[in-house]
Amino acid sequence: MDLFFAYMFVASATPLFLWLEHRKIALASIPFIIVMWVLALAHIFDGFLFDLHHSAFVTAFLINVFIAHFAALVLYVYPHLRSKSRRFTQSTE
Protein backbone atom coordinates (compact mmCIF):
# COMPACT_ATOMS: atom_id res chain seq x y z
CA MET A 1 0.00 0.00 0.00
CA ASP A 2 2.96 2.34 0.54
CA LEU A 3 3.86 2.14 -3.14
CA PHE A 4 0.27 2.96 -4.11
CA PHE A 5 0.22 5.86 -1.68
CA ALA A 6 3.50 7.28 -3.00
CA TYR A 7 2.33 6.97 -6.59
CA MET A 8 -0.97 8.63 -5.72
CA PHE A 9 0.95 11.79 -4.85
CA VAL A 10 2.82 11.61 -8.16
CA ALA A 11 -0.41 11.02 -10.09
CA SER A 12 -2.04 13.91 -8.26
CA ALA A 13 0.73 16.24 -9.41
CA THR A 14 0.50 15.16 -13.06
CA PRO A 15 -2.14 17.79 -14.05
CA LEU A 16 0.11 20.53 -12.69
CA PHE A 17 2.88 19.57 -15.11
CA LEU A 18 0.48 19.31 -18.03
CA TRP A 19 -1.57 22.43 -17.41
CA LEU A 20 0.36 24.94 -19.54
CA GLU A 21 0.83 22.86 -22.68
CA HIS A 22 -1.81 20.11 -22.60
CA ARG A 23 -4.87 21.23 -20.68
CA LYS A 24 -7.19 18.60 -22.17
CA ILE A 25 -5.06 15.76 -20.81
CA ALA A 26 -4.79 17.52 -17.45
CA LEU A 27 -8.54 18.00 -17.20
CA ALA A 28 -9.18 14.41 -18.30
CA SER A 29 -7.00 13.06 -15.51
CA ILE A 30 -8.65 15.00 -12.67
CA PRO A 31 -11.79 12.79 -12.32
CA PHE A 32 -9.66 9.65 -12.17
CA ILE A 33 -7.46 11.22 -9.50
CA ILE A 34 -10.51 12.09 -7.41
CA VAL A 35 -11.89 8.56 -7.78
CA MET A 36 -8.50 7.11 -6.89
CA TRP A 37 -8.30 9.15 -3.67
CA VAL A 38 -11.90 8.38 -2.68
CA LEU A 39 -11.32 4.67 -3.19
CA ALA A 40 -8.02 4.78 -1.30
CA LEU A 41 -9.77 6.40 1.65
CA ALA A 42 -12.51 3.79 1.37
CA HIS A 43 -9.82 1.13 1.57
CA ILE A 44 -8.31 2.74 4.65
CA PHE A 45 -11.71 2.96 6.35
CA ASP A 46 -12.65 -0.63 5.50
CA GLY A 47 -16.25 -1.50 4.85
CA PHE A 48 -17.18 1.73 3.10
CA LEU A 49 -17.86 0.21 -0.32
CA PHE A 50 -17.65 -3.51 0.57
CA ASP A 51 -15.71 -5.57 -2.00
CA LEU A 52 -16.36 -3.26 -4.92
CA HIS A 53 -13.73 -0.74 -3.86
CA HIS A 54 -10.82 -3.18 -4.36
CA SER A 55 -11.36 -3.67 -8.08
CA ALA A 56 -12.42 -0.05 -8.63
CA PHE A 57 -9.30 1.21 -6.82
CA VAL A 58 -7.01 -0.95 -8.94
CA THR A 59 -8.82 0.20 -12.09
CA ALA A 60 -8.54 3.89 -11.15
CA PHE A 61 -4.89 3.36 -10.20
CA LEU A 62 -4.06 1.72 -13.53
CA ILE A 63 -5.84 4.47 -15.48
CA ASN A 64 -3.77 7.04 -13.58
CA VAL A 65 -0.58 5.10 -14.31
CA PHE A 66 -1.45 5.17 -18.01
CA ILE A 67 -2.27 8.90 -17.98
CA ALA A 68 0.92 9.77 -16.07
CA HIS A 69 3.13 7.75 -18.41
CA PHE A 70 1.39 9.22 -21.46
CA ALA A 71 1.95 12.68 -20.00
CA ALA A 72 5.64 11.93 -19.48
CA LEU A 73 5.94 10.80 -23.09
CA VAL A 74 4.14 13.88 -24.38
CA LEU A 75 6.14 16.30 -22.25
CA TYR A 76 9.64 14.84 -22.45
CA VAL A 77 10.04 12.21 -25.18
CA TYR A 78 8.02 13.73 -28.03
CA PRO A 79 9.89 17.08 -28.09
CA HIS A 80 13.21 15.24 -27.97
CA LEU A 81 12.25 12.97 -30.88
CA ARG A 82 10.89 15.91 -32.86
CA SER A 83 14.16 17.84 -32.49
CA LYS A 84 16.14 14.77 -33.54
CA SER A 85 13.97 14.25 -36.62
CA ARG A 86 14.43 17.90 -37.60
CA ARG A 87 18.20 17.56 -37.31
CA PHE A 88 18.09 14.35 -39.34
CA THR A 89 16.01 15.89 -42.14
CA GLN A 90 18.22 18.99 -42.22
CA SER A 91 21.38 16.89 -42.46
CA THR A 92 20.03 14.82 -45.37
CA GLU A 93 19.11 17.89 -47.41
Curated annotation (Swiss-Prot):
Keywords: Cell membrane, Germination, Membrane, Transmembrane, Transmembrane helix. It is found in: Spore membrane; Spore outer membrane; Cell membrane. It is a multi-pass membrane protein. It comes from the Bacteria. Its main location: membrane. The chain crosses the membrane at residues 1-21, 25-45, 57-77. GO terms for cellular component: outer endospore membrane; plasma membrane. Required for proper spore morphogenesis. Important for spore germination. Belongs to the YwcE family. This is Spore morphogenesis and germination protein YwcE. The lineage of its organism: Bacteria, Bacillati, Bacillota, Bacilli, Bacillales.
